[in-house]
Amino acid sequence: MPTYAIGDIQGCHEPLLRLLDVVRFDAASDRLWFVGDLVNRGPDSLETLRFIRGLGDAAVCVLGNHDLHLIALAAGHGRAHKGDTLDAVLAAPDRDELLGWLRRQKLAWREGDWLMVHAGVLPGWTADEVMRHAAEAEAVLAGAHYRDFLAQMYGNAPVAWDDGLEGVERLRVIVNAFTRLRYCSAAGEMEFHHKGAPGTQPSGWLPWFDVPARKSADLAVVFGHWSTLGLVNRDDLIALDTGCLWGGALSAVRLEDRQVFAVKCRQARSPTG
């Protein structure tokens, strides 16, 4: 019963099908972990959502920033961005079923010594705190009053975690960490502007996973989000955004032995950072 973790798809449905052929995916016995950003910017967000939802228990998904953007737009919050390719989802006859399914997905998923998130985790959070904070925000997103949070979801502040945070500020830090984080300070302050590869960042910022004494370092973290980072496969993390959207590859890792599989992708968009 192998488990394959798959990088950011962003509506690139055809490469996903080719990748599943490469790994000889069997829905009756195999499992797929999706690191989020199932939709947007690629050509086939609607087909991608329908396909992954149809996998049922064979698929585990965590939410990415583009997935949350879709949920917010459908709820009448946020504003469409140049380059969005979400109109087909928003106009689909089954949009309510698809979006209801999407907002019930997780922000963090843990099995044994593996942890999956879309972007990152704050270095001051233990593994138990990661799951507890994820559950807080997941309950709001899946609940009856999710629109109240979506109306105030966007924003960078606060940039750091504090146990005393309450309300929307607390939820915003949690969601930003799981879905937007790349760099932070040694003290855990998040930086949201720089998107380049490690080594190009301004002084004082570190990749979140390289902050000294990161409290979740006892887990192997599987994540995406960071196309300029590319594929990384080391003991404490696997990074899986290999730029499918930008003409790179869609990648998967079989967790049992860390074997990497990939298919080349036709460029659907020019990188903007």
UniProtKB/Swiss-Prot annotation:
A Pfam family per the record: Metallophos
Alphabetical keyword list: Hydrolase
This enzyme's EC code(s): 3.6.1.41
Entry keyword annotation includes Hydrolase: yes
InterPro entries membership: ApaH (IPR004617), Calcineurin-like_PHP_ApaH (IPR004843), Metallo-depent_PP-like (IPR029052)
MF annotations from Gene Ontology: bis(5'-nucleosyl)-tetraphosphatase (symmetrical) activity
Reactions the enzyme catalyzes: P(1),P(4)-bis(5'-adenosyl) tetraphosphate + H2O = 2 ADP + 2 H(+)
UniProt keyword ATP-binding, yes or no: no
Function: Hydrolyzes diadenosine 5',5'''-P1,P4-tetraphosphate to yield ADP.
Stored PANTHER family: CYTOCHROME C5, PTHR40942
Family affiliation: Belongs to the Ap4A hydrolase family.
Protein name: Bis(5'-nucleosyl)-tetraphosphatase, symmetrical
